[in-house]
């Protein structure tokens, strides 16, 4: 596996590749990231992973400075997973001048759900992803379903800019107790980690209720928020949405996704479960 840090070295490493599959990350990798690399390998060509903690997607008071930088350990995991090339630029390599141009993500996607609590976040995500797409020029890019809103933002950006990239979604990996794997789980204290699976359980309860015929979506979400708040969580949102557009679900909505973001102590956790009328949880 080759590791490069500059744009010139990245281009040289890919100069003879007819196609590639790309997995963008911020590092501090876990088994969920590894599964995305393994999924990328199914699509032919070298697998490229990026490791870059993107300052544009962090707001004031967020965890940019304390986000773990674990490049050596990350490269070991990527090599074991069969990754071919790692692009690990520093900030000056990816942003050689002030990034005054940004991707303008529509408010319906950028200012709802996580965007309502993290202003500018999705513009920062879309901007860095577009830059990385321009540099790597992949035919396939793999993103995790755990960051569901991010996945839809990237898909819509690719569609609207006519980018010749197939966006592939990888399933959310979970610990045995149901907690979705996340680089930020390491922030949790032992007591918080023991409580954290409640978030997934609340989403699963909503999915089960919908599968059982419940259709008062507002009441289901409100009850989950109340239970989480009563257990000491600080809830940003619990919502039931159209899985394709993230618009508020109605009785006619066929594909549903239940999404949540909530804080345990100083750690913000997100999760989601998709709903299908026949099979319940899809991911």
Swiss-Prot record:
InterPro entries: Pantoate_ligase (IPR003721), Pantoate_ligase_C (IPR042176), Rossmann-like_a/b/a_fold (IPR014729). It is found in: Cytoplasm. Beta-alanine binds at residue 57. It is an enzyme of class 6 (ligase). GO terms for biological process: pantothenate biosynthetic process. It comes from the Bacteria. GO terms for molecular function: ATP binding; pantoate-beta-alanine ligase activity. ATP binds at residues 26-33, 144-147, 173, 181-184. One of its GO terms (cellular component) is cytosol. Its EC number is 6.3.2.1. Pathway: Cofactor biosynthesis; (R)-pantothenate biosynthesis; (R)-pantothenate from (R)-pantoate and beta-alanine: step 1/1. It catalyses: (R)-pantoate + beta-alanine + ATP = (R)-pantothenate + AMP + diphosphate + H(+). Catalyzes the condensation of pantoate with beta-alanine in an ATP-dependent reaction via a pantoyl-adenylate intermediate. Belongs to the pantothenate synthetase family. Homodimer. The reaction proceeds by a bi uni uni bi ping pong mechanism. PANTHER family: CYTIDYLATE KINASE/PANTOATE-BETA-ALANINE LIGASE, PANTOATE--BETA-ALANINE LIGASE. This is Pantothenate synthetase. It comes from Thiobacillus denitrificans (strain ATCC 25259 / T1).
């Amino acid at each position: 596996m080759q590791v490069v840090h500059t744009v010139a070295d990245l281009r040289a490493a890919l100069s003879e590749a007819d196609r590639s599959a790309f997995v963008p990350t911020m590092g501090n990798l876990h088994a969920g990231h590894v599964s995305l690399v393994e999924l990328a390998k199914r699509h032919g060509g070298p697998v490229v992973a990026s490791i870059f903690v993107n300052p544009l997607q962090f707001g004031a008071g967020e965890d940019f400075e304390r986000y773990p930088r674990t490049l050596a350990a990350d490269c070991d995991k990527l090599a074991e997973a069969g990754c071919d090339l790692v692009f690990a630029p520093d900030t000056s390599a990816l942003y050689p001048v002030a990034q005054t141009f940004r991707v303008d993500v529509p408010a319906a996607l950028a200012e709802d759900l996580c965007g309502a609590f993290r202003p500018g976040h999705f513009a920062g995500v879309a901007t860095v992803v577009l830059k990385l797409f321009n540099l790597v020029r992949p035919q396939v890019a793999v993103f995790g379903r755990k960051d569901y809103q991010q996945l839809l933002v990237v898909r819509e950006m690719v569609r609207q800019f006519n980018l010749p990239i197939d966006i592939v979604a990888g399933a959310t990996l979970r610990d045995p107790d149901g907690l979705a794997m996340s680089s930020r789980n390491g922030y949790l204290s032992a007591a918080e980690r023991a409580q954290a699976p409640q978030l997934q359980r609340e989403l699963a309860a909503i999915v089960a209720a919908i599968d059982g015929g419940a259709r008062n979506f507002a009441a289901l979400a409100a009850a989950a928020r109340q239970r989480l708040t009563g257990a000491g969580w600080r809830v940003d949102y619990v919502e039931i949405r159209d899985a394709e557009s993230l618009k508020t679900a109605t009785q006619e909505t066929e594909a549903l996704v239940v999404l949540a973001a909530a804080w345990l102590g100083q750690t913000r956790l997100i999760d989601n479960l998709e709903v299908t009328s026949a099979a319940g949880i899809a991911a």
